[in-house]
Amino acid sequence: MYQEEFPYQIRWAEAEDWTPAMNMIWKTFMKFEGPEYTSEGIRNFLDFITDEDLFHSFLQGKYLMLVATDGAQIIGAASVRDGNHLSLLFVDERYHRQGVGKRLMSYLCEILKKEAGREDITLKAAPYAVPFYRKIGFWATGPEEHYSGIIVTPMRKRL
């Protein structure tokens, strides 16, 4: 079977990647998730991705993030906290349906299993992302939740 080579790079994020990654995340959030959230939810999401404590955790290696790049441009990002909880997964809309999100998740799951000895990964999926996560092997562990203006479905995947 012919399999096309993945044309983008996936690597650990560095300090200088933080701002461009968060800008891409914010832009993508506002396009695909923001319309379903209340103004409170949008504010809470923005507060989360601009939180200085989160940035410092990243700099200290406590908040891990992978980025996908096309040349020098960050086109996707995936981050994990608390050892095995996917905190953020976003792909620039121009790169949707090109395997970027799937590849980021594949790399992240492999790292969690082989290097960190984790048996599963959890996340709280926005409504827009639930079909994607189901397609890559996640299942809902509870009903859709609404809190602080944010809508999520708790999900899990065995590694």
At which residue positions do the language-model features occur?
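A short, internal acetyl-CoA/4′-phosphopantetheine-binding micro-motif in the GNAT/acyltransferase core
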Residues: 86-96
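A short helix-loop-beta-strand connector motif used in the catalytic cores of GNAT acetyltransferases and
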Residues: 51-66
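Conserved GNAT acetyl-CoA-binding A-motif
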Residues: 112-126
